[in-house]
């Protein structure tokens, strides 16, 4: 949502409620260590050189520190865990005057706290939380009008494909073009003065194909189009698409943000006030905002997001290397492998390869056996939780895409998608090694 002043600089209390114990203050899009002395904020640093604290540059805290120490400065009781405002309404100041909060469909303090934090870590001015990733995507599609065109990555999440082709494209007369966005020339050939939205996933789901976000941003903007990035595979820990030229970034909060597969949610972030206002209006009018309780679950989960992402990625790298060397694996996609075609480009626009891997065996019976017989990989859809997951996208997350379209983009029946968790990596590798060693039953 468009954030009140108290949320734009969430570590800085208002002059009325300043607390001398407050240690962090946001400055622009970075952070400075600060201390509040008698409600007067001054930059300070502990040094051994005698340099004046007023002139000593202070290092910014890491993302892990920010996520753990983030708190709601509006809370009069200074709770270490953000309170859940589980209420439908708030009492008015008078018969003719609302307070800052009056109806939770429009605004809620618990959700505001999460939105403020997500805006901060996405390097955005505005952030909005929705009841699911799909409702977040719906808010973006509301920016497109009949007669407009959408250019989208061809290797796209099945739910997104179904939505923009069957619900938006067919009903509203919007032309949807599925393009190999790893090929900049193909992107250019499909752009026109009717293109309103360019829709990317990088890496894509499930084949983890990498697109040049910086270059595509320039192409989109040359045609006056909006560049939208579904960043769910990466999380704000590993990628900040707004810094690369994107206009809107989306996350499925269900995944890395909440982190425990315990709630459904989505988020949108942008630096464009006009786009932000339109998305916020959609959020309020349709009643699709994230509930106070689910906002709280995300706030609790996000505290460990940086650590979880780091551990999951470490495990995924080792598992990808194991799979790449296994004779029964015919093809593997993971941008952390030097052999991956998107390796260098991905490294230039992200902080790591993430924890999602896809691979092929050339045999549906073998792939089916791997999915069904692993011990520590839950046979389920989604990704980004603490536990490892495994599925066949053809039959699950991408089942709504026509078979011909799946085959066209290389998504075959035997493709296995892994979401690597935080378990002991030796256990995970041994688990995969065991199922790969068993002869499949035809």
Swiss-Prot record:
Its EC number is 4.3.3.8, 4.4.1.13. One of its GO terms (biological process) is transsulfuration. CDD domains: CGS_like (cd00614). It comes from the Eukaryota. Changing residue 284 to N: Reduces catalytic efficiency 4-fold for both mimosine and cystathionine. Optimum pH is 8.5-9.0. It is an enzyme of class 4 (lyase). Keywords: Amino-acid biosynthesis, Chloroplast, Lyase, Methionine biosynthesis, Plastid, Pyridoxal phosphate, Transit peptide. Optimum temperature is 50 degrees Celsius. GO terms for cellular component: chloroplast. Pyridoxal 5'-phosphate binds at residues 103, 105, 133-134, 252, 254. Forms homodimers. May form homotetramers from two homodimers. Catalyzes the degradation of mimosine, which is a toxic secondary metabolite found in all Mimosa and Leucaena species. Catalyzes the degradation of cystathionine, but seems to have lower preference toward cystathionine over mimosine. This is Mimosinase, chloroplastic.
